Amino acid sequence: MTYLLALDQGTSSSRSIVFDERGRIVAQAQRELPQIYPRPGWVEHDPREIWRTQLATAQDALREARITAQDVRALGITNQRETTVLWNRRTGQPVHHAIVWQDRRAEPACAQLREQGHAAAIQAKTGLLIDAYFSGTKLQWLLDHVPGARDAAEAGELAFGTVDSWLIWQLTGGTRHVTDVSNASRTMLFNVHTNQWDDELLQLLRIPRALMPEVLPSASDFGATDAALLGGPIAIGGVAGDQQSALFGQACFTAGMAKNTYGTGCFMLMHTGSRFQKSENGLLTTSAAQASRSPEYAMEGSVFVGGAVVQWLRDGLRAISASSEVQALAESVPDSGGVMMVPAFTGLGAPYWKPDARGTITGLTRGTTIAHIARAALESIAYQSAALLAAMSRDAVAAGGAPVSELRVDGGACVNDLLMQFQADLLGIPVVRPAVVETTALGAAYLAGLASGVYASTDELSALWQAERRFTPTLPRSQAEALMARWEHAVAQAVLPG
């Protein structure tokens, strides 16, 4: 039996999963990762804890699977994107906590870039909107605020990386400073047309090129693990940011294929093939995971509050005592009774981009019960995702393609049958849940398998992908369109005047 090991480093935990060559889970392990909140709007991790927890889960997973390093053909890494680590090349020690993707401290630098008129040029080169979310201004902040960091960086003494780079550095004993195109494309420093760091963007943000890792395709030779760590060397063959890895794990390899990950928020990606396409509908363009040196792209949109609305029902309203209870409560009524919820607790993300929007519940009557509100909360996840898919389809059609014909789903909330059926009804296309829902880790394993010869091509991976359940639309299109019109009216009400 051939095995592949996937390291899945996330915002709240580090996980490792052992897969067999058919993509089936053999064993898995998880360790919590504490977050650090030094000030309002600031979010950090200790990079040493990222490494400690990730290594421990890899060791645990191999032990649980009752295999050794010699049984593992290759290792793949997938990771929280944009989170920024800066470390000393000689000692291997971080010079500061990692600045997490959620952190907003670089917003003043972003505002300055926008005011100086750089938005169009940055989007043209990177596919991204100027935002503190991305790594570039986080790195700029570290160089400007950590004593001695800028001088050390210019002297070539420091290394920058997203979480994948940091893990590879540690896994290889400091011999490899590399990343992949999907992670590089989230820095706001990477030219997605040339697949290279962009000198003009580096100069604009005053970042020395000596800091930057080598960029490789997502299925490549990233080095091998130090033999002392896992009981023997293991080739590192696959690396991809979490959302691009999930797209790959869902076998979305061709233009027009799309997936939605239902987590705390929702992340929807649509593959656009070898075509870089600028969105006219509020979406980002990003590099997809690349199995070869040929550039591949995707359009991406994110919903800020997805499964988090269920947590709010539990912790805020105390309508349920456990998240798993929401489906039964929502199913206790035939519909939402006219109640519409817009969970804009932190504004609205794509395709609206309304940071000043606030959460609303409309359509309340004396007959409204907590079950109606729970159903409206659950349905709000589907409404937001439907608006996102409509924006993607408009972009696809504008570029001469076809609208998305099927949505593949993963993430914690995809197990909710009521939500998935309502999603299919709103979209008017099938929603497909895979047999293996750990698609983020599976994508990393698939990439490692391609690099190490376990798989000959992505065609082989497409044949391995299996659906667990297919939700087909049951609602007439006229009804679905009327519901979406009510949703858009509710969104307009959620935007504060002035």
Curated annotation (Swiss-Prot):
One GO term under biological process is: glycerol catabolic process
The entry's protein name is Glycerol kinase
Recorded family membership: Belongs to the FGGY kinase family.
NCBIfam families in the record, alphabetically? glycerol_kin, PRK00047.1
* Origin species: Acidovorax ebreus (strain TPSY) (Diaphorobacter sp. (strain TPSY))
Top-level taxonomy? Bacteria, Pseudomonadati, Pseudomonadota, Betaproteobacteria, Burkholderiales
**Annotated signal sequence range:** none
Residues bound to ADP: 11, 15, 264, 307, 412, 416
Q: Which residues bind ATP?
A: 11-13, 264, 307, 311, 412
Q: Which SUPFAM superfamilies match?
A: Actin-like ATPase domain
- List the cysteine pairs that form cystine: none
How is it regulated at the activity level? Inhibited by fructose 1,6-bisphosphate (FBP).
Q: Which UniProt keywords apply?
A: ATP-binding, Glycerol metabolism, Kinase, Nucleotide-binding, Transferase
Instruction: List the GO terms this entry assigns under cellular component, sorted alphabetically.
Output: cytosol
Residue positions binding glycerol: 81-82, 133, 242-243
